[in-house]
Amino acid sequence: MRYTSAERVAQGGLVAFALVFAVVAFAVLFRGGEAGPGASPTPTAPTISRAPDVTITQATCCKQTARLLLATWESSAHINAAKVAVTPDPGFECSASIDANGLKGTFSCRGLLKGATDYVANLQLTTPVGTFPFEHRFKTMGERLTDVKWFTEFEDPTGEPLSCAAASCRIIQNYTTGKDPLTAQAILDLGRQFNRSNDPGLDPVAIATVLQRMDASNHYHYYRFDTREDATGAAVYWLVRSGKPVMVISLAGQHGPVLMGFQGTFGTYYDDPSNRITGVVVEDPQRGDLNPQTQNHRPDKYRTAGFQTGQLIGLDEWYGDEWWLRFAYPASIKMPDGSFQNIERNDGAYPTPHWEKKFVILVDDGDADNPPDREGRVKFR
């Protein structure tokens, strides 16, 4: 069939009209009709999953970290779920928690991690828009703490040896906070008001209290044990658990060296069968003092610079020498004039005898709700 030129033009116009009609109909159909006066179509933006800002805080982190993992996290966005995985695998459960407000929480492990090991805690937090990973790296402490600065108890070389515990408080304060606000004498003067006994120096309550007064992040409490072996095992346990030095009350209640290391192995919990302690590493505020003017105090006991950086003491000496743990805490001590002075706790807070015939240590147990004048209450065995 043939068409004239006029017919072809008419057919082309019809096709063009149909095409325009189809385009308009398509637009109306898929835009839901014409918008009202003054309205504009709402653009559709792609969903953006942005990770929240998260801060992770871990005490003693990150080069000689406590072997008990306990860290806190805080998020800028509400968290619906949290979990953590630790590598290398410690062989026991690690978990994460969320506080009621959904903006912070903790993550921890059930046992002690291996010493001198690089770990990565992989924290996963879930918000309404997605799940996001956060990596926390740290290295656990080895058998001993390093960079524990030593201080003497003989700030006055001609003074009486009453500042041993105060000097050890200064050592602990400096290591745990990096600050050195008070001399041993100033710590002794400050701490005596907190004594709960007639101790001429600082008793266990005063030691714990003055450490917390100097820095609120320190939560030291005293613990009592029936045997020197149990006290030593607990001291090493708390050393590696807290990553902080331990003070041991020695010399029959009259001295307070700082335990900052051990020789041997310590497993994943207090009564771990693999635990083998063959020696302890201590700093001593008196026996590290090499000033000739102070040598008249206990000249029968050797002095060495090792007590300024950490002296290894074998268990035979540690258990058998009266300077260390040969004798338990007594009810009274002999004074320079030959008289005896009672040093038992006497404020009525506990039945007596309380310290007598016990081996006493002071540790940071992290128990912020327990006042420092109370005995430690954390169950660890």
PLM regions with names:
Residues 2-17:
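N-terminal Sec-pathway targeting helices
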Residues 24-47:
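C-terminal region of N-terminal signal peptides and the immediate post-cleavage residues
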Residues 110-118:
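Surface-exposed, short loops/turns at beta-strand junctions within beta-sandwich domains
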Residues 139-200, 315, 322, 326, ...:
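Active-site-adjacent structural segments surrounding the nucleophilic cysteine of cysteine proteases
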Residues 39-83, 115, 124, 134-143:
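N-terminal non-catalytic regions of secreted/periplasmic and cell-surface proteins
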Residues 186-347, 351-357:
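Conserved active-site-adjacent core of cysteine acyl-enzyme catalytic domains
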